[in-house]
Regions:
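Active-site metal-coordination/substrate-binding segment of hydrolases
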Residues: 64-128
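Metal-dependent amide/peptide-bond hydrolase catalytic core
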Residues: 5, 47, 168, 177-354
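Active-site beta-loop-alpha junctions enriched in small/polar residues
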Residues: 23, 72-74, 134-136, 162, ...
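Generic recognition of long tandem-repeat/solenoid scaffolds
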Residues: 53-57, 93-98, 272
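Hydrophobic/aromatic beta-strand patches that form the interior of the parallel beta-sheet core
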Residues: 67-69, 130, 157, 316-318
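N-terminal helical capping/dimerization or prosegment-like subdomains
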Residues: 1-78, 240-244, 258-261, 335-346, ...
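Acidic/histidine-rich catalytic neighborhood of metal-dependent amide-processing enzymes
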Residues: 105-175, 179
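Buried hydrophobic packing segments
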Residues: 34, 108-118, 146, 199-202, ...
């Protein structure tokens, strides 16, 4: 394995992808370009569903366990604070600047290069590479759809910026839309029933309640009121007040359990947008985790959401870059981080026994 050549290929591919806008649900052009490189330049037999791409390594055997390599092709929209063109890949010293360079382009190109190295080897497991769309919006046409067309997966390695440290647990997400009901009236008279005051009582509970079961890796469930809206004009007592709750769950609770606790304690009407995005965890004793530890990696719990939330099998999140750079102006990745990722991914996977 020539790490220098693979790193250069990865950098070239990353620069190509940075210059193609690929916000969530608008990844077609980037997927077209990536598929062309994978098929024509790398000789990878590439399948496609929508804007999702995947490859299955030679020698697939249903009797073997299957490991999935995953990264996402979509990006968030650039903020107004960029001082550079977010869609122009700029190399300055060791840094590559551009939208999606850190999240999630570096993981994507590193995993593609490692898959190239491993696809023809006789591995004791099946290897699949999947590049998913719509990760940033947890869309139904990304990983959720991919999992309906891929073979059965036993474990996944999800490439996200973690400094190449293994995240073995990840917080889930549930968003609740809450409506407090009152009765309209004239603000000058002692009439009506102010929905804002009912909402404030419930928001006070949201602010002060602590879920009793905490996680050693992920800490407590985090519940935050983030949006509030009520009223139409200053002299009318509002009959409704809507507010939104953002809940980041740990693995001690299902989203359904948290929803029931909230409903039991709020007087307002509560609706969950979805229960899909669950907290995830892989056992510390899993061979993938143990191999990472043997390579000097330190397991941790991640507060940020990824496509792991849609995976109903064990998964570990590990990739080049730093999560703090994601979704920020002048996002960047270091070329040395990509080189390190290619080497570590290869060492992690080449002699792995599941």
């Amino acid at each position: 394995m020539n790490v220098e050549n693979l790193t250069q290929d990865a950098v070239n591919l990353l620069c190509k992808l940075i210059e193609i806008p690929s916000t969530s649900r608008e990844e077609k052009e980037a997927a077209d370009a990536l598929a062309e490189v994978m098929q024509k330049d790398y000789g990878l037999k590439t399948e496609r569903e929508g804007n999702n791409l995947w490859c299955i390594a030679d020698g697939y055997d249903e009797a073997k366990k299957t490991l999935l390599l995953n990264a996402h092709i979509d990006t968030v929209k650039p903020t107004s604070l960029w001082t550079r063109d977010p869609h122009k890949a700029t190399i300055e010293g060791d840094c590559i600047y551009g939208l999606g360079s850190n999240d999630d382009g570096a993981s994507l190109v590193s995993l593609v290069e490692v898959f190239r190295c491993l696809k023809d080897k006789e591995l004791p497991y099946n290897l699949i590479l999947a590049i998913s769309a719509e990760e940033e919006v947890s869309g139904k046409n990304g990983m959720e759809h991919l999992l309906t067309v891929l073979p059965k997966i036993d474990v996944a390695l999800v490439g996200e910026p973690t400094g190449m440290q293994p995240a073995i647990a990840e917080k889930g997400l549930m968003v609740l839309d809450v409506t407090a009901h009152g009765k309209a009236g004239h603000a000058a008279r002692d009439e009506g029933d102010n929905a804002i005051y009912h909402a404030l009582d419930d928001i006070a509970w949201v602010r002060n309640y602590r879920f009793p079961k905490e996680s050693g890796l992920l800490g407590p469930v985090k519940m935050t009121a983030t949006i509030i809206n009520a009223g139409t004009q200053h002299n009318v007592i509002p009959s409704e007040c809507q507010f939104t709750i953002d809940i980041r769950s740990n693995e001690q609770y299902s989203n359904e359990e948290i929803y029931e606790i909230v409903c039991q304690n709020l007087k307002s009407e509560v609706k969950a947008r979805s229960f899909r995005l669950s907290s995830s965890r892989i056992d510390m004793g899993h061979p993938l985790v143990q191999k990472a530890i043997s390579l000097g990696r330190t397991p941790f719990g991640s507060p940020t959401l990824s496509d792991q939330a849609l995976m109903r099998f064990p998964s570990m999140k590990m990739g080049p870059g730093n999560s703090s750079r994601s979704h920020t102006a002048d996002e960047f990745i270091k070329i040395s981080e990509i080189s390190e990722a290619i080497q570590l991914y290869y060492e992690l996977l080449k002699d792995l026994f599941l």
